[in-house]
Amino acid sequence: MKRQLILEDGTVLIGTGFGGEIEKSGEVVFTTGMTGYQETLSDPSYCGQIVTFTYPLIGNYGINRDDFESIHPSVNGLIVNEICNHPSNFRNEISLNDYLKERNIPGLAGIDTRKLTRKIRQYGTLRGRLCNMDADVEYIVSQLKATVFTDHVKRVSTKDPYPSPGRGHRVVLVDFGMKHGILRELNKRDCDVIVVPYNTTAEEILRLSPDGIMLSNGPGDPKDVPEAIEMLKDIIGKVPLFGICLGHQLFALASGANTSKLKFGHRGLNHPVKNLATGKVAITSQNHGYAVEEESVENTDLEITHVALNDGTVEGLRHKKFPAFTVQYHPEASAGPEDANDLFEDFLTMIENFKKEGEELCQNA
């Protein structure tokens, strides 16, 4: 079955279709991970996107029940050079092709993914549509140029609060499109977690008596979530806070900094990040299309703690006055290296220190 990818600049790439027999539009991006395709297609941060894999053969080890980052995949399509229809792995339960058919997600194989990746790197992220061979190219191009993708966070955030009980510190986890890996890391440390929707107010969060607040990853432009920015303005300084990815960007906006769209984003499992305080470099998992503008941090109460070695963009922030820090990358990995996993320990240490300071103030009062 032939299928084509039509880009907003009029480029047409023809290959073999797999997965769901449906036409879908989305922002065409690329990821450089050699593995982790199951985590990628189930990562809510990819909501509304058509993901191109730069590694030439995808699907080798199939799909298993353990590696999902959300219950429902959020990608609008997959593009690969070659798909493996006969996976081999002791955990394999279903092939990637069959899984995408079940979930009605279209795929395209047999195209030059290097050519597509170079185009995205040269011209920036492009809107595209995976469609049948009888599609009207001119009409599709006109529709793509007029399309604006919004409300991604609303689509992937939980609709209702729910608990993930533990005996340790109570952490309110604000879900902007949370990867399950973040929740797993908190559960591993016996945190008493309450997951809440993206539009939960500061008053509602504080009513839960949290020891700490965690801001999850999520899709899209942080400026499309004004309610979260307002919530953070009211909550920063009252409770220890740790943000990841979109949570990092929202924290920056609430603190007076600015964000902007990257030309083609950071997506992959091997991005080097430097800790400016220690000089240490961590290899990190990343997935974002926006970043905090370095110059905008200067006149705020924030300090830059980490930078990307590939392009110098801001990868970490800390508040100068209050117990709050954030990172642009994914310390929970899933998939990817676990070099930055100790940030969860730093978060819990910050909570403990904040509690001790509060107890000392009460004793001295």
UniProtKB/Swiss-Prot annotation:
Residues 1-166, 1-169 are annotated as: CPSase. Pathway: Amino-acid biosynthesis; L-arginine biosynthesis; carbamoyl phosphate from bicarbonate: step 1/1; Pyrimidine metabolism; UMP biosynthesis via de novo pathway; (S)-dihydroorotate from bicarbonate: step 1/3. Residues 170-357 form the Glutamine amidotransferase type-1 domain. It is an enzyme of class 6 (ligase). GO terms for biological process: 'de novo' pyrimidine nucleobase biosynthetic process; 'de novo' UMP biosynthetic process; glutamine metabolic process; L-arginine biosynthetic process. One of its GO terms (cellular component) is cytoplasm. Its EC number is 6.3.5.5. It catalyses: hydrogencarbonate + L-glutamine + 2 ATP + H2O = carbamoyl phosphate + L-glutamate + 2 ADP + phosphate + 2 H(+). The keyword Transferase does not apply. The keyword Nucleotide-binding applies. Composed of two chains; the small (or glutamine) chain promotes the hydrolysis of glutamine to ammonia, which is used by the large (or ammonia) chain to synthesize carbamoyl phosphate. Tetramer of heterodimers (alpha,beta)4. Small subunit of the glutamine-dependent carbamoyl phosphate synthetase (CPSase). CPSase catalyzes the formation of carbamoyl phosphate from the ammonia moiety of glutamine, carbonate, and phosphate donated by ATP, constituting the first step of 2 biosynthetic pathways, one leading to arginine and/or urea and the other to pyrimidine nucleotides. The small subunit (glutamine amidotransferase) binds and cleaves glutamine to supply the large subunit with the substrate ammonia. Belongs to the CarA family. This is Carbamoyl phosphate synthase small chain. The lineage of its organism: Bacteria, Bacillati, Bacillota, Bacilli, Bacillales. The gene is carA.
